[in-house]
Amino acid sequence: MPVPGWGSYPPFDRDETSAITYQSKLRGSVTVYDPYSALEVPSNDSEETKAFILEQNKFSRAYLDANPDRQTWLETLKKSWHYRRFTTPTRESDDHFYFLYNDGLLAQSPVYRVKVDDVDSILTESGPGGELFFDPNLLSLDGVATLTGTAMSPCGKYWAYAISEHGNDWMTIYVRKTSSPHHPSQERGKDPGRMDDVIQHCRIFFVSWTDDSKGFFYSKWPPDENQGNGNAPGVDCKIYYHRIAVFLSEDPEHPGWFWNVEVSPSGQYALLLGTRDASLNQLVKLADLHTSDIETGIQWTTLHDSWQARFSIIGNDNSLIYFRTNLEAENHRVAAFNVHHPQAGFTTLVPGSLDSVLLDAKLYGINKLVLVYQHLAKHEIYLHDIETGRRLRQIFTDLAGKMTISGRRADHEMFVLYSDFISPGTLYRQLLNRYKFDKDTDKGLLFRTIKVDALNLDDFVTESEFYPSKDGTLVHMFITHPKDVFTDGTAPVLMYGYGGFGAPMFPNFSISNLLFCNIYRGIGGSEFGESWHREGMLEKKQNVFDDFRAAAEWLVTNKYARKGGVAIRGGSNGGIMTTACSNQAPELYGCVITIAGLQDMLRYTKFTFGDLLRSEYGNPENPEDFDYIYKYSPYHNIPLKEVTMPPMLFLQSDYDDRVSPLHTYKHVAALQHRFPKGPNPIILRIDLDSGHYAGKSTMRLIEETADEYSFIGKSLGLTMHLPNNSNYSNRWCVLG
């Protein structure tokens, strides 16, 4: 067979002797060969891995840059991303509202603030308003410093914040006085005004201040020589109190457990939460900070130690503490715990729903409880009486998308930011009577709207469909497309899915996805997370792949997509799905995009936080689990028969310490070896000096998206349709 027109893949030496023996319940001892195990060694410790990255990038860049549509995509995305966007304003204890604002192409979004009395002046057509408080773009020369978490002290004088570099999970916590904001004219690469407090080796932002503002609880990990290279293990998490570095929690028998502390909004109670796996079920302990001495040691009382549920503290009224929990309520409930009567346990205040998941709960005023539910894939907000739990009414009944709320109990208002697949964001201001329920004064007002000039969003529509999976189960899917694209079986479709950890796919606005719909005259849809999480985990993981495959088949059968015109896209856990599906039905998909996925499911527990994921995927060293994991593990199930694999683009960051890059490296090497002269390309694009999704600058995201969409267009044989005007309207559709 001649060499394909796009050239030969970079060579890499296989080790045919590398193997591990596993125990199978069905087959006894099973020897599994791993010829690319050398790629498990990070690039900063291995010349082989370093050379592999270099050669793969040379190869992929040559292919991607040869596509004339790539540059057109790049320029189109730059123009289209140039629209202002912001987050929900949050009132803090220094009597300011804080919010993120980006005018379009800034690498990272700066933090702005405004005095409470001047909140009406912010987010106008002329700009953010208020004053610049903190700009992460000033911390580095190339926009790689990311603000990953913040926590204001109760007194309003101190602001704790975490900075990560290159999108890495590892972060450093700093503290600055709120009286020391950034200035736009300051020198880049520095952070003047911060205090001497520096806390390194943090991996997840768990910061909770005590009510005296003298310090805060935080979680950290010990230094590790693999920190930042994608292979550092997530073990030995410990809880500290910053002011005097008092060591609060250690469990040498369980080094893989995570610990964090939540302080109640009143500041009286601290909740110590232990997490041991990806189920996020917790060990829960409580302490009264008003009667404890942090210096001499906190006395913790165990509230729950059976690892059967998750808890988050909502607030408290004296000794009565309110929790959001899924204890004895699969979809979560609001429960109350009386510290003075612990024998009563967690009593139900608002029972769990049968068809809606309680996502968030906040207290307002004297007796108001605001609850945010997920119903199907949209959010619903209800107002309850905290004393009786009685539902008073639903607010924002005409909205059917994603809603984020902010506010404090002391406030008489909250902000609600709404978005969906075709709405970039509408900010509402909900007024709440502090003392009673009043239908005349408790009302929502339109505050601000995010506008996109590059597209006429009224030209798009989102449909909601149910389709049967392999076993007959009805699965939900969203489909977004231009109104003038019809179901005649000629359109391309881009499918996105995640399918794991009980994470639902909420309607999420993406200008890039709408541009795909608008330019390629296509159709887009979204796999609806896992409403039935247990039916898609462990030994039932195959159900997720069956659901995704059934969606593609349904779209073709019902003429939403043309045969061979379905492109699939997934990242992280979704990367298991795209690679497993392309192994199992390569003929069904016209193109496959995989972003930072897991592929070697027999080795995933050995790297980064992999050991915590056993509750989701199973333990390959357990004979029963081995049998079902080995059956679908993408790296071990590349087709042996003569098949034509679809065009495949793998996107990976070299310093990803959430999902180790070794998965992608090994899988791509194996695919290229198995199909060296196939008619379709198997391409690996490695983003250097970056981590798992978060922290990428706006321009890096635009460049990556241009590579993705031009690759899809070429793979599906699509022609770009750009009108002569600047609105790019009515041309493509994407699956969101």
UniProtKB/Swiss-Prot annotation:
InterPro entries in the cross-refs: AB_hydrolase_fold, Pept_S9_AS, Pept_S9A_N, Peptidase_S9_cat, Peptidase_S9A, Prolyl_oligopep/macrocyclase
Catalytic reaction equation(s): Hydrolysis of Pro-|-Xaa >> Ala-|-Xaa in oligopeptides
Biotech applications: Dendrothelin A displays slight activity against the plant-pathogenic nematode Meloidogyne incognita.
Pathway(s) served: Mycotoxin biosynthesis
Assigned keywords, A-Z: Hydrolase, Protease, Serine protease, Virulence
Domain of life assignment: Eukaryota
Protein name: Prolyl oligopeptidase dbiP
UniProt GO MF annotations: oligopeptidase activity; serine-type endopeptidase activity
UniProt enzyme class: hydrolase
Repeat keyword on record: no
Gene3D superfamilies given in the database record: alpha/beta hydrolase, Prolyl oligopeptidase, N-terminal domain
GO CC annotation: cytosol
